[in-house]
């Protein structure tokens, strides 16, 4: 069974959320049921649940790892928006 570390973006508040799940679709749907503004912007898949939990913990505890990932996500979103503007 695969395990996932994911990042959601709240389109209304621009807040990012880090989570862990073994069923990514179901977990994202649960977030969206509470607040439809959440959207999946990034995820990592792991064969080991322990590895995924450790990665989630690292991102939440170590500011440099989370900061690096946030910059990566932001660059990706900026490029996507630029592409959408050209269409």
What function would you assign to each model-found segment?
Residues 1-60, 64, 71-87:
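GIY-YIG nuclease catalytic motif and its immediate N-terminal context
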């Amino acid at each position: 069974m695969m395990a996932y570390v994911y990042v959601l973006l709240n389109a209304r508040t621009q807040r990012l959320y880090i989570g862990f799940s073994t069923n990514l679709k179901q977990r994202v749907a649960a977030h969206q049921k509470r607040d439809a503004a959440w959207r999946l912007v990034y995820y990592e898949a792991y064969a080991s649940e322990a590895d995924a939990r450790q990665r989630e913990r690292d991102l939440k505890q170590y500011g440099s790892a989370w900061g690096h990932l946030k910059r990566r996500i932001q660059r990706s979103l900026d490029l996507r928006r630029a592409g959408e503007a050209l269409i």
